[in-house]
């Protein structure tokens, strides 16, 4: 499995069966990647919460880092999450109007920065309102609306950031590629972490605020004295 160059074998698997992405020579199943179902569940449940109550569920966004290297994972927001009355991604978000779109932007940024490859189901990159159905095309007309175009532009910018910076992907399966700066600021629902590159020269610092509260003069530490660019 997965021996042909350019071919990727991905397992949609939700049990604790070990070595799904391990080599067959070592008793594994030989898949290239495995869906991270635990991350998907925790992420969507957290994002649905009113920001006021997120402080009580802070660990839902940090728990996946404790097992992120047990397999070669892909972070998935699949068709399963936007059908059968589960709502589209934008309609999972709490609040009204601007708050919904701001929540979705923060969620997508967290997903892009988290270790693991990425898979987002079609339509969610421009905040499709209706659930997906195989009986109709996507609601492309929504892109005439500024808020939907803004989400598409945001996701495009995240993809460009991902492609441009090796720290976002080259150590996905190595604990050396990810470091929490502050995983415990539950009262303000802020997460900060660093993605490291192999040469440890072009690292990226993520600071994500999951409340609508503006935080002025928020201090973030870095692990060593280096020049940083915002």
State what each model feature region is.
Residues 132-142:
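Active-site His/acidic residue clusters
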Residues 146-172:
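Catalytic cores of secreted or luminal carbohydrate-active enzymes
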Residues 96-98, 142-149:
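A short acidic, glycine-rich active-site loop
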Residues 1-134, 163-173, 177-227:
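Conserved alpha/beta catalytic core and glycan-binding cleft of carbohydrate-active enzymes
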Residues 230:
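Segments forming glycine/polar-rich beta-alpha architectures that bind adenosine-containing cofactors
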């Amino acid at each position: 499995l997965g021996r042909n160059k350019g071919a990727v074998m991905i397992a949609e698997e939700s049990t604790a069966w070990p070595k799904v992405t391990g080599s067959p020579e070592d008793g594994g199943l030989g898949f290239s990647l495995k869906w991270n179902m635990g991350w998907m569940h925790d992420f969507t449940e957290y994002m649905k919460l009113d920001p006021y109550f997120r402080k009580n569920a802070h660990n839902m966004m940090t728990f996946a880092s404790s097992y992120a290297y047990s397999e070669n994972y892909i972070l998935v927001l699949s068709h399963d999450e936007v059908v059968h009355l589960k709502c589209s991604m934008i309609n999972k978000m709490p609040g009204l109007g601007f708050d919904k779109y701001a929540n979705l932007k923060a969620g997508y940024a967290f997903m892009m920065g988290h270790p693991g490859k990425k898979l987002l189901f079609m339509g969610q990159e421009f905040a499709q309102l209706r659930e997906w159905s195989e009986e109709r095309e996507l609601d492309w007309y929504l892109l005439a609306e500024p808020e939907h175009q803004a989400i598409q532009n945001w996701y495009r910018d995240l993809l460009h950031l991902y492609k441009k910076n090796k720290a976002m992907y080259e150590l996905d399966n190595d604990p050396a590629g990810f470091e929490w700066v502050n995983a415990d600021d539950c009262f303000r629902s802020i997460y900060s972490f660093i993605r490291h590159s192999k040469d440890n020269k072009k690292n990226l610092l993520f600071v994500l605020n999951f409340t609508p509260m503006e935080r002025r003069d928020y201090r973030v530490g870095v692990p060593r004295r280096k020049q940083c660019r915002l």
